[in-house]
């Protein structure tokens, strides 16, 4: 009996030893060097994928944050340009306004000259206001030809003048063309200085003299082409004989009798 009990006790101890020596599968996975601690097998892989998604979201957020900064900087540059142009236009307007209020004292102007100077400055101010409005509201002109031109140099005005001439001379056959030009020249010259008006007047005077010479030459040519009194052939022969000292030897008389 004692031997049987001892054997049973030995088997019991062996069973207990085997029981306590069993490895916990959860612990085994955890002891395999995974970063998840007490996670099941494969669970750490899911978490890694999730972490990658978070990284993508963070990158997208950073890109989204950078884009508005670029837009803001561009808008800021445009706003600064507009402000700079506004300052320049305002300065120009102030100068024009000052000249309107305080006429030049160094040069004595007649009432007509003062009026012309004020009209010219007023026109400049209106043009300045118009340009400022266009730049402020971003007006983009899509017109062509004369309306699209904004001449500033000598060459620009030369080209501008050619276009105007081609446009106006289309109607030179009209009955109202001369009166139209008279009114047009008077209106466009009203703001000019006296010296400039004299230059234009002299230019027109020279043009008028040239036209008169051409007209006289044209009338003289028409008179030469008229009928010669006394007959063309006989008069020509008399002129030829007269070149020999006026002696005809009776040949002219014989010729006339024969005719």
UniProtKB/Swiss-Prot annotation:
The modification Phosphothreonine is found at residue 110. It is found in: Cytoplasm. InterPro entries: eIF3-like_dom_sf (IPR023194), eIF3j (IPR013906). GO terms for cellular component: cytosol; eukaryotic 43S preinitiation complex; eukaryotic 48S preinitiation complex; eukaryotic translation initiation factor 3 complex. There is a cross-link at residue 107 (Glycyl lysine isopeptide (Lys-Gly) (interchain with G-Cter in SUMO2)). GO terms for molecular function: identical protein binding; translation initiation factor activity. The keyword Phosphoprotein applies. It comes from the Eukaryota. One of its GO terms (biological process) is formation of cytoplasmic translation initiation complex. Residues 63-107 have a biased composition (Basic and acidic residues). HAMAP family: eIF3j (MF_03009). Belongs to the eIF-3 subunit J family. This is Eukaryotic translation initiation factor 3 subunit J.
């Amino acid at each position: 009996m004692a031997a049987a009990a001892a054997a049973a006790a030995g088997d019991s101890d062996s069973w207990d030893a085997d029981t306590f020596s069993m490895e916990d599968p959860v612990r085994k996975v955890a002891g395999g060097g995974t970063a998840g601690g007490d996670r099941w097998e494969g669970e750490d892989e899911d978490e890694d994928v999730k972490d990658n998604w978070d990284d993508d979201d963070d990158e997208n957020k950073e890109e989204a944050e950078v884009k508005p900064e670029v837009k803001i900087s561009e808008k800021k540059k445009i706003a600064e340009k507009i402000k700079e142009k506004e300052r320049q236009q305002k300065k120009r307007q102030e100068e024009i306004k000052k000249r309107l209020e305080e006429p030049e004292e160094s040069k004595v102007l007649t009432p007509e000259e003062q009026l012309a100077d004020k009209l010219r400055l007023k026109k400049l101010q209106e043009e300045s206001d118009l340009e400022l409005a266009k730049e402020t509201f971003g007006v983009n002109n899509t017109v062509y030809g004369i309306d699209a031109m904004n001449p500033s140099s000598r060459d620009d005005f030369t080209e501008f003048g050619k276009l105007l001439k081609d446009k106006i001379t289309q109607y030179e056959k009209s009955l109202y063309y001369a009166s139209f030009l008279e009114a047009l020249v008077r209106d466009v010259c009203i703001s000019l200085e006296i010296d400039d008006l004299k230059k234009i007047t002299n230019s027109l005077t020279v043009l008028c003299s040239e036209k008169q010479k051409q007209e006289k030459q044209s009338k003289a040519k028409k008179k030469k082409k008229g009928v010669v009194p006394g007959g063309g052939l006989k008069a020509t022969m008399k002129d030829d004989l007269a070149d020999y000292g006026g002696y005809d030897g009776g040949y002219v008389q014989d010729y006339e009798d024969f005719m």
